[in-house]
Amino acid sequence: RRSSDLNGHEVVLWGREDHIADEINQAHTNSHFLPGINLPTTIVATTDLKAALDQATVLLFVLPTKAIRSVARQVASYLSQSDAQPLLVHATKGLEQGTHLRVSQMIEEEIPRQDYQDLVVLSGPSHAEEVARHDLTTVTAACPNLKAAEKVQALFKNHYFRIYTNTDVVGVEMGAALKNIIALGAGVLAGAGYGDNAKAALVTRGLAEISRMGIKLGADPLTFVGLSGVGDLVVTCTSPHSRNWQAGNLLAKGYSKEAIEEEIQMVVEGIATCQSAYELAKESGIEMPITE
C-alpha cells in the first residue's frame, strides 16, 4: 500500500482506546483529537501493541512523558524476542518527574542498546492539526549519530514538512521540554489582559533561562536559537492552539490544575515539567525565575 500523504510508508498507530482505533480504521478520521481532518486510508490503528510492532522498521514514540517508561518497557519485552532492531524516534516534549530525566534517557534505560539501531529526537514548532492539514512545517531531527538523523530526515520530508538535522540531543530535548513552561506563562499574561510588550519580555527572558539550563547540561548554545529553541518557543507562546498556552490562560482565570486538565481534555506537559525543571534548577544552581 502506498500513499503520497504518507511518503509511501505503511503506518500502524497504537493506542489504548478501542473506539478511537475503530473510527480511524472505518471512517479514517479522529474526531476527538483531529476534528475536520480526513486521514489517509493507509493508516491502520490497533490497541494490540504486539500487532503494531510486528515487522515495524521504525518505531515513533508520541506519548505523554509519564507514559514513556511503561510503554518503552513493553516495547523492550517484544524486541528482546525479535530480530527486528528498528530505528527508534521520539517526539515527546517533557522531563520525568522525580528523576528529571529527558525522554531519550528514559527510553535508553528501558530498551537495551543492542535491540535497536539508533534513537532520534524529532522536535520543533509543529502543531499537530497544522501538520495534518499539510501546512508548511519545519522541525529538527537530532541524534549523536548524524546518519541516523539524516535517515529520519529522508523518511519524513516532503513538500510541506522539512527536517533539519543536528547531533545536539540535549539541546533539542531541553528546548522542547522547557518551552512548555514559558508557554504557561504566556497564557497567564494573555488571561490577565497584558499586551505585546509583556509577551515579548516573557519570551525573551524565557529563552534566556532555557538556554542557561540547557548549557549547564551540556547543550550547544546555538541550538536554542534554532527550530527546537526559539522556533518552538515562539509558536507555543503565541498560539491559542497550544495546550500549555490554554492552561496558563485558564490559570489566570482562576481554574485549578484539576479543572484545567478536565477542560482541555489532553495532556498539558508544562504543568509536570515545571515542577521537574524547578527542582533541577535548584539542584544545578541555575537561575530560572519564570519557572519559579
Predicted regions and their residues:
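Alpha-helix C-terminal capping/helix-to-coil transition sites in glycosyltransferase folds
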Residues: D54-Q55, L178, V230
